[in-house]
Every structure is written in structure tokens, then in C-alpha cells.
């Protein structure tokens, strides 16, 4: 639908395998498509509207209607006592992600909010497939699920396009200009969470109060591999620290993802 041929995909994989720069014109085209995906996401109706019209305004209207339908379902299907709490949790997600440290806090949902009051409401949203949780881990070692901290997690929208539609008007235009670093990196992080989730991967991260924070952890070839997301070519201080102390963190290599060429 976007004119990308299998040979282009094969070429891109070859460049990644060899850690070689992608041809500038091909890189620019894939980058353009990535920015479009951030705005459109993967909801079938939104994708169809974009392919048929190429009008972001129509896509945004569909996405915001879907978000409104989610809210209506919360009122329709949830228990009476949970209805306002579910909506509060859902509507807090952009604010949760816009903070420097993106751990989900119930006090952000409502001042004085506690986990025991809202845990069931957040679970309802997760069970509906609207969000994905990303759990903090005790260590940067396998097994990731066995090391997860149940009470510490970030919450991402399952569909990046829906997250962007929940932000203020004009965000889409900024993204098309290549500005993926807004909201303290929330858009770029949620993009990676969207991609990993659609690959069938559970989400984990690593944060310690000493200042070490790795955006994602994944199992790859029998190892724990950190993933650092930097929309710009910023420093990955935590990654350098972890790689510099293999005896402590047991990490041999890491992946840095950004909006730039190899």
C-alpha cells in the first residue's frame, strides 16, 4: 500500500545486521512511514481511512471516536462503583507518561489515590486490551517475569495512534515534522512498547533510585538485553553504566533505538 517492496525490507535488514548506514533516500522514506505510523497507529478503521484519503484530520476523528467508545464501554459494562475510577485511570495515561519517571502512580489519577482503590479499575482497562503494563524488575537478569516487581509498572497505550489522538491538537503536525521527542520521550517510548507488544512480547524495564533506568528489557538469544529509546541522539548514560559493569548487571550488549540513521 505504501510502495515498499520486499527488496527494500531485505536491504534494511542487511544494513541492520551489518550495522551499516541505510542509503539516505531509503532511510528518509522509511522514516516518513514511521512518523505516519505513530500518528495513524494500527486500528483497522484508522488505517483504512488514511490509505484511502491521506487526510490526518479524518484519521484523528476516527481515533477520538474510538476513545469515546472506550469510555462509553467503561460506563456500560463496568460495575457501578468502578465506573468513575476506570475512566479516571484511563484519562490519566497521557499525564503519567509525560513525567520524567513514567512509573504509574495512583496519586496522579487523583490526589491521595491509592492502589487498593484503583487496582481493579486499571485491571479492567488492561483486560479490555486498551493498555499494556511494563513492569520494573529487581535485576537485569533472566527470568524477567520472575524478577518483576508487581507493584511498580509503567502503563502504555496498546495503540500508539490512540495515545497521540489523546494529546492536544497539533501534535500530529509536530510528529510529521520529525519531532518524536515530545512529552519527555513518551511518544517514542510508547511507539516501542506498541511494536514490542504487537510482536507478542511482555514488557519490562529496569529502574533503581541510584539513577539507573533502562527503558525496556527483553530476552534475546538466552540473554537479558536492555533497550534504550532516544528519539534524538542523546546520551545513554544508564546503558553505558550497565555495559561498563558486566560483573554487576550481567549484560553483554544492548540496543539503542532512535530517530536517526545507523
Go through the PLM ranges and name each one.
Residues 204-205, 226-229:
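Short catalytic-loop micro-motif centered on adjacent basic/acidic residues
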Residues 223-225, 253:
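Structural motif
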Residues 1-42:
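Amphipathic alpha-helical segments of the small helical/lid subdomains adjacent to P-loop NTPase cores
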Residues 48-221:
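Accessory nucleic acid-recognition modules appended to NTPase machines
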Residues 231-262:
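Catalytic cores of nucleic-acid endonucleases
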Residues 30, 118, 189, 238-241:
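Amphipathic coiled-coil/heptad-repeat helices and related helical stalk/stem segments
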Amino acid at each position: 500500500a505504501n510502495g515498499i517492496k520486499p527488496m527494500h525490507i531485505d536491504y534494511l535488514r542487511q544494513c541492520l545486521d551489518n550495522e551499516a548506514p541505510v542509503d539516505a533516500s531509503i532511510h528518509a522514506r522509511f522514516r516518513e512511514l514511521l512518523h505516519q505510523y505513530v500518528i495513524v497507529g494500527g486500528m483497522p478503521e484508522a488505517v483504512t481511512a488514511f490509505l484511502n484519503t491521506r487526510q490526518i484530520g479524518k484519521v484523528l476523528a476516527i481515533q477520538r471516536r474510538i476513545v469515546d467508545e472506550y469510555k462509553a464501554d467503561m460506563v456500560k459494562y463496568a460495575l457501578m462503583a468502578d465506573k468513575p475510577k476506570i475512566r479516571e485511570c484511563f484519562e490519566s495515561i497521557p499525564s503519567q507518561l509525560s513525567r520524567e519517571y513514567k512509573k504509574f502512580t495512583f496519586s496522579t489519577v487523583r490526589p491521595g489515590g491509592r492502589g487498593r482503590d484503583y487496582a481493579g479499575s486499571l485491571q479492567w482497562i488492561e483486560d479490555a486490551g486498551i493498555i499494556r503494563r511494563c513492569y520494573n524488575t529487581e535485576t537485569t537478569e533472566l527470568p524477567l517475569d520472575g524478577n518483576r516487581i508487581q507493584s511498580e509498572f509503567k502503563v502504555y497505550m496498546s495503540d500508539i495512534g490512540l495515545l497521540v489522538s489523546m494529546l492536544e491538537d497539533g501534535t500530529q503536525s509536530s510528529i510529521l515534522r520529525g519531532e518524536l521527542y515530545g512529552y519527555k520521550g513518551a511518544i517514542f517510548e510508547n511507539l516501542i512498547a506498541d511494536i514490542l507488544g504487537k510482536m507478542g512480547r511482555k514488557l519490562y524495564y529496569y529502574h533503581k533510585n541510584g539513577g539507573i533506568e533502562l527503558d525496556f528489557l527483553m530476552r534475546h538469544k538466552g540473554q537479558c538485553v536492555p533497550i534504550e529509546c532516544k528519539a534524538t541522539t542523546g546520551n545513554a548514560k544508564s546503558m553505558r553504566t550497565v555495559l561498563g559493569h558486566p560483573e554487576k548487571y550481567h549484560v553483554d550488549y544492548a540496543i539503542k533505538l532512535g530517530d536517526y540513521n545507523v
